[in-house]
A protein has these predicted regions:
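Alpha-helix-loop-beta-strand connector modules within alpha/beta enzyme cores
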Residues: 244-253
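Proteins enriched for Cys/Gly/acidic motifs involved in redox and nucleic-acid/cofactor modification
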Residues: 1-237
Length: 253
């Protein structure tokens, strides 16, 4: 059997490096689930990966610096002959997009949240030398109706547009800790002058209780004994379903 055929059958390797908050941790595990389902081999050490995906944070200056340092460090691994590409995802990538691409030649691609549903396809294109159009930032608050109660319907109708790009997908745990985050919602409707999160994370949207409970059971089956709830604004949970007591009801299931 030729070495070419062997290489074609060998799984491609990817490392996910996560910076920032627990929300990014859940995003990374959902990306890992998508990649594993498509046959990618997940490795812990970026030096062992053909492609390093850096899940960046863009909230405060120190977090931005950490993200930039991580991208530069990942780029330096190309000298080892294993790492072929460095990809930025996450909040800083979403928030700055084209600006980050202009300033960071160390990255081979900067992907948006909208690319998450096709993450395997995107990484395959990049690793094969193809080019991905650089993400152009937009105000994600405009992607859903202003009235929260209209969002549950619009979300279901717009699944093809992947407004909530991760939705319900199998997570793949990236550690064996007995404690794990559980995402209950995305985005925020607050307009705090010091916070840009609604601009790049979008308007508030709750996950359906059935989805949350299903994922909680899955985490328990995988050795998790303690969960902590994650969202940009937990106190708003359920308002887009017209029920601010939805948390109380869910916990009584």
């Amino acid at each position: 059997m030729s070495s070419k055929i062997l290489d074609e059958k060998k799984p491609r390797t990817v490392a996910l490096v996560t910076l920032g908050c627990a929300r990014n941790e859940t995003d990374s595990e959902e990306l890992a689930g998508r990649l594993a389902a498509d046959g990618w081999q997940l490795v812990t050490n970026p030096a062992d990966a053909e492609i390093a995906v850096i899940n960046t944070c863009g909230f405060i200056e120190s977090a931005k610096k950490d993200s930039i340092d991580a991208l530069i460090q990942a780029h330096s691994l190309k000298a080892n002959g294993v790492t072929k590409a460095v990809v930025a995802v996450g909040c800083m990538a979403e928030r700055y997009g084209t600006e980050l691409a202009q300033e960071m030649s160390e990255t081979d691609a900067i992907l948006s949240f909208d690319d998450y549903k096709d993450i395997s396809e995107r990484l395959n294109t990049i690793i094969e030398g193809g080019k991905i159009k650089t993400h152009v930032p937009k105000d994600r608050r405009t992607l859903l109706p202003i009235a929260p109660v209209d969002r549950a319907t619009s979300r279901d109708l717009a699944k093809g547009k992947e407004i909530n790009p991760l939705g319900t997908v199998p997570r793949k745990r990236l550690d064996n800790a007995p404690i794990a985050p559980l995402k209950i919602a995305s985005g925020c409707d607050r307009r705090c002058s010091f916070c840009a999160i609604p601009y790049f994370r979008g308007s508030f949207i709750s996950r359906k209780p059935a989805e949350i409970i299903e994922e909680a059971k899955w985490l328990a089956d995988n050795g998790v004994t303690e969960l902590y709830l994650v969202s940009e604004n937990t106190t708003s949970f359920g308002k887009d379903f017209g029920d601010l007591k939805m948390m109380e009801k869910m916990l009584s299931y």
